[in-house]
Amino acid sequence: MQVIIISGLSGSGKSIALKALEDSGYYCVDNLPASLLVILINHLQTQHHSHVAVAIDMRSGDSITVLPWQFKMIDKSIRTEFIFLDTRTDTLIQRFSETRRRHPLSDKNITLEEAIQHEREVLATVSDLGHHIDTSSLRPNALRAFIRDFISDSRDPSQLTLMFQSFGYKHGIPLDADLVFDIRCLPNPFYDPHLKELTGHDLEVIRFMEAQPNAAKMLGDIGSFLDTWLPVYMQDNRAYLTVAIGCTGGQHRSVYFAEKLALHFRDAARVLVRHRGLAEYNQYYARR
């Protein structure tokens, strides 16, 4: 039996993620009180459900605070994954404004921003239970793609998920980054008129980067650092590790580095790649 638990801030994309799992054949339960998690799983196991997804959030009230304990009480024979969706406050305010939806914690006595902050503080107790995903700049189809890749990975579920994420500093550091490497000191293909409109996926940019001695040295140093410390992270029983590579715009250098590193570590962990700065590539995909 496989169980995927989804939690996160209101407006972060939980409904989209749950619908993607339902479309993939999962038996889905939305807005479950956290205190009923183990009871539900045990019941569904007796009903021979093999794939189950459950969404638990602040709509269930203060019972969300017991989720860490409930999570630990799940039978160890059941493959269990936890996904926490996070989003920047300014993005959440914009989403609620555009959809004209009411935040579940808002009332006439507090502002929307205050409601979001309160929810963030309460959910801090559960945000580190598993895969922490920043959906601030993630489009719905990209979130669906991440879910599809996540459930299609047949590797050992206890194996650490290693995510390489390229980004542009002009849009801020990703919320879900565990390690951040700044490569803005390297020559920028953006200033070459022939490369300006291309990306780190294009052969011309790849050749440009490969011709830079410092780029090769920095790539090797980052790879060596991860070669040394990745086993230590694994021994710490971490479920995931997000490595963010940042350049100015997230179009050329960081994309090249993320792809190279993902290729290097594809046999060492469950590897995912995301290019936050590329609209057409703003999605997660598995590197196999």
UniProtKB/Swiss-Prot annotation:
Disulfide bonds: none annotated. GTP binds at residues 57-60. GO terms for molecular function: ATP binding; GTP binding. This is Nucleotide-binding protein Neut_1559. NCBIfam families: PRK05416.1. InterPro entries: P-loop_NTPase, RapZ-like, RapZ-like_N, RapZ_C. It comes from Nitrosomonas eutropha (strain DSM 101675 / C91 / Nm57). It comes from the Bacteria. Belongs to the RapZ-like family. Keywords: ATP-binding, GTP-binding, Nucleotide-binding. ATP binds at residues 8-15. Displays ATPase and GTPase activities. HAMAP family: RapZ_like.
